[in-house]
Swiss-Prot record:
Membrane topology: Multi-pass membrane protein
Classification of source organism: Eukaryota, Metazoa, Chordata, Craniata, Vertebrata
Subcellular location field: Mitochondrion membrane
Subunit structure: Associates with the intermediate 315 kDa subcomplex of incompletely assembled complex I. Interacts with TMEM70.
Primary residence: mitochondrion
Gene Ontology cellular-component terms listed: mitochondrial membrane; mitochondrion
Origin: domain of life: Eukaryota
GO terms (BP aspect): mitochondrial respiratory chain complex I assembly
Keywords noted in UniProt: Chaperone, Membrane, Mitochondrion, Transmembrane, Transmembrane helix
InterPro entries the record matches: TIMMDC1 (IPR055299)
Protein name per the record: Complex I assembly factor TIMMDC1, mitochondrial
Function: Chaperone protein involved in the assembly of the mitochondrial NADH:ubiquinone oxidoreductase complex (complex I). Participates in constructing the membrane arm of complex I.
Residue spans crossing the bilayer: 80-100, 137-159, 165-185, 188-208
One Pfam family recorded for the sequence: Tim17
């Protein structure tokens, strides 16, 4: 019995041709080069160095960063609103406490109490009710006033990316007009004028204090924004470098595989005897 003839070279080449490891290195290198040169592929990695418009800066005020923290401008507005609420509560509550206690003592001269402690406790209850009632009225009004004023002023400053005295005047006009809008059109106009007149000297005072300190709030915000932008740009460069080196790592890993062993296994499989023909094919013959 003759030995089976060796597998033809053409069959080996045909089996080895579509094998995925043959042209993988070249394909990976081509993909790496095309990624570096193709700007469309590089666009999938977001570039933080692009210029920002006024609306982009304004939108970032209400968006949390990567650490789920609000912007410093919004933090300043919230802190100012809380401080204004506390100051307003003290401004309206303390005089109301004293007035309510005095008024209760004047109106309760004819009342009969069991002891002195009961009379003092009743007077303190009346004073506490006055403190809570009038303190809350002044508190929420002051907090809303300061919040609207700071929001408009900060929004204009961030949008235009500079400090200006007109921002304080516009913020005062908007705040005063909204607080007097319940009086109709005349109240809206009068409140806007009064707010602008009060906002202008307040803005002048704040800007003078900032210049005296040597650094304005906008300059500090600009420095913080530039530092964040530089940090994002550095992170973007690292991510881009990792993305460009990934195909090279894949290529080096594929080159470490020994193709001789794979070729030997394919030759052994091709030398195995063929499967016997099926009964259907024999009947056809």
């Amino acid at each position: 019995m003759e030995a089976p003839p060796p597998a033809p070279r053409s069959r080996l080449c045909g089996a080895w041709g579509p094998f995925p490891r043959v042209f993988a290195a070249g394909a990976v290198a081509a993909d790496s080069q095309s990624f570096v040169e193709d700007p469309e592929l590089r666009s999938y990695v977001s570039d933080p160095g692009s210029s920002e418009s006024g609306w982009d800066r304004l939108r970032q005020l209400f968006v949390k960063d990567e650490q789920r923290k609000i912007s410093k401008e919004m933090d300043y507005i919230c802190r100012a609103a809380l401080s204004a609420g506390i100051i307003g509560w003290a401004y309206g509550g303390i005089p109301a406490f004293i007035y309510a206690k005095r008024r209760y003592i004047e109106q309760s001269q004819a009342e009969i109490y069991h002891n002195r402690f009961d009379a003092v406790q009743s007077a303190h209850r009346a004073a506490t009710r006055g403190f809570i009632r009038y303190g809350w009225r002044w508190s929420w009004r002051t907090a809303v006033f300061v919040t609207i004023f700071n929001t408009v002023n900060t929004g204009l400053t961030v949008y235009r990316n500079k400090d200006a005295l007109s921002h304080f005047a516009i913020a005062g006009a908007v705040t005063g007009g909204l607080f007097r809008i319940n009086l109709g059109l005349r109240g809206l106009v009068a409140g806007g004028i009064i707010g602008a007149l009060l906002g202008t000297p307040m803005g002048s005072l704040l800007m003078a204090l900032e210049k005296h300190c040597g650094e304005t709030v906008q300059e500090r915000r600009q420095k913080d924004r530039e530092a964040q932008q530089e940090q994002r740009l550095e992170e973007w460069r690292r991510n881009l470098q990792v993305t460009e080196l990934l195909p090279m790592e894949i290529e080096s890993g594929l080159e470490k595989i020994q193709p001789e062993k794979d070729a030997q296994r394919i030759e052994e499989l091709l030398r195995l005897p063929r499967n016997p023909a099926s009964p259907d094919k024999q009947s056809e013959d």
